[in-house]
Design a protein with these regions (language model features):
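Nucleotide-activated chemistry modules centered on ATP-dependent adenylation/adenylyltransferase
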Residues: 2-239, 243-250
Length: 250
């Protein structure tokens, strides 16, 4: 999109992301927006500083309630629309039905933490770590009447692993490993003390990032670390960059 904006002669590209930019010593840094509840820098961690210098974020210093008041004052047609929690450009729709148009899902076994098969899933890609809903696991013989949660997925064998209890230790990780790492502005090496955020609107926790080994160790355990999602790093509300989670470290 930025290439197109340049092609038509635009000097800048404005987006509706809740994010901010800081300019220091001819460098461009990505910073959290003033509305920390809506901050979207997590989604922008793979954009480079060379691209950010052409971006404008008009919502950087506005909260969502303030944006709504502006929309009402100028009578925008969507001024009373509820907040969206769907994926951008996909919208509010049944995700399973949407994905079924592009992916053939195969059922597979649901396995408990004692390696017993206790059910069948509709396709392991449809489930996420920490998920409770949709497992369709009834009463299991000789097991307590507690809810089941996904704690691991084996994509190669199309298997789903579950445990009982929201606070089961199997759901928590002491760290994670990364597939790759992208820096937005400054590059780092060795070990870096910073904060890591593992999903949108999730509390960032202090950590030590080993840049050379692509490993992260948390100061406190984090629940439901999910391979394939992003781990994004911050220092004093500046988004340093991030990477794709390869695996949990327990």
């Amino acid at each position: 999109f930025l290439d197109y904006a340049k092609k038509i002669g635009a000097d800048f590209m404005a987006t509706g992301h809740y994010a901010d930019l800081v300019f220091k010593k001819e460098k461009t840094y990505l910073r959290r927006s003033i509305d920390l509840n809506k901050d979207q820098t997590y989604f922008l961690h793979e954009v480079s500083s060379n691209e950010f210098k052409y971006c404008l974020f008009p919502l950087a210093n506005l909260t969502k309630p303030e944006v709504r008041e502006i929309a009402k004052s100028i009578q925008l047609p969507n001024r009373n629309k509820k907040d969206s929690v769907g994926i951008c450009f996909v919208g509010e729709r049944n995700m399973k039905d949407f994905l079924n148009r592009f992916i053939d899902f195969e059922p597979g076994p649901i396995i408990d933490d004692s390696n017993n098969i206790i059910g069948e899933h509709h396709g392991s890609l449809l489930y996420t770590i920490g998920q409770r809903q949709g497992l369709r696991i009834g009463g299991v013989k000789d097991m307590p009447d507690l809810p089941w949660y996904v704690f691991k997925k084996d994509q190669k064998n199309n298997s789903l692993y579950v445990c009982q209890g929201e606070d089961n230790p199997l759901l928590f990780s002491k760290g994670l490993s990364l597939e790759r790492l992208h820096w937005i502005t400054d590059e780092f090496s060795g070990q870096l003390e910073c904060e890591v955020q593992v999903r949108h609107r999730h509390k960032a926790v202090k950590c030590i990032l080993d840049v050379n080994e692509l490993e992260v160790r948390f100061d406190e355990e984090i629940r439901a670390i999910t391979p394939g999602q992003s781990a994004v790093f911050y220092l004093d509300n500046i988004c340093l960059g991030g990477g794709i989670i390869a695996d949990q470290i327990n």
